[in-house]
């Protein structure tokens, strides 16, 4: 009798413990970027984690895996497959999962961060990310600034597209970036990020392109003599979530997570723009010859590169998608500048 009662009590406690465990949600979040821990993106992620855990009264725990589960491509794949619950990724890899997302890599799509922010929060972007969710099971919670990309090299100042001719330039492993470099007359060499510094040090390539914050944080300035702030492509970060997992959460928890993701975006946006200016000045002080390209020079780069990349992306994502992206970017520009 006693043994029966003991077993019954143990079973009751186990069930109660199970119910308590089910009440608390543990979410796995990973970052596939190489940003410094004090970078705007990283500060935004910390703000998001703290907000979600505080607002849920500890019922949601966010476990951070920082650069331990691969780069953006790997963490995006993990979110798609459900190995990760959510993650920060960048728009340059999403074209591998949903081809229309390649269209955001068009050179000189945005004249400023303010226009890009307007675009990211606009109706068209909501439609694009919703289409991606339906096609892939990857839900987008928020978009934020990754930054404008600039050119560095070890051979000469780059003021116009003609200065690019003959340079061997490292690119991401992306056909869009290869098309961009080739349109300027440079020899594009796709190299994985971990091998970039060795390639620059040994002159396998003459230069590379990246956000100023990356050039500073990764110490690329130590092996490059020249930098051109030509802001040729704007990079976006996205907080993505496995759609099935998100739908399994309570409405209250969904709302808190969405709010946290938006807090990340607002925090990152305000910090990223400042960080880029500070990094550029630090690079100059470190001895690199920095040229800030004029609007006239940027227009030369746009004319030389944009159509070639647009034509390539149209073969991948469709001309109608490219036309819609260009129209939405123009709409965002008018919303900011009023003309």
Annotate each PLM feature.
Residues 1-6:
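Bacterial N-terminal signal peptides that target proteins for export
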Residues 7-15:
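Hydrophobic helical h-region of N-terminal Sec-dependent signal peptides
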Residues 15-21:
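Sec/Tat signal peptide C-region and signal peptidase I cleavage site
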Residues 22-115, 124, 130-339:
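N-terminal secretory/targeting leader peptides
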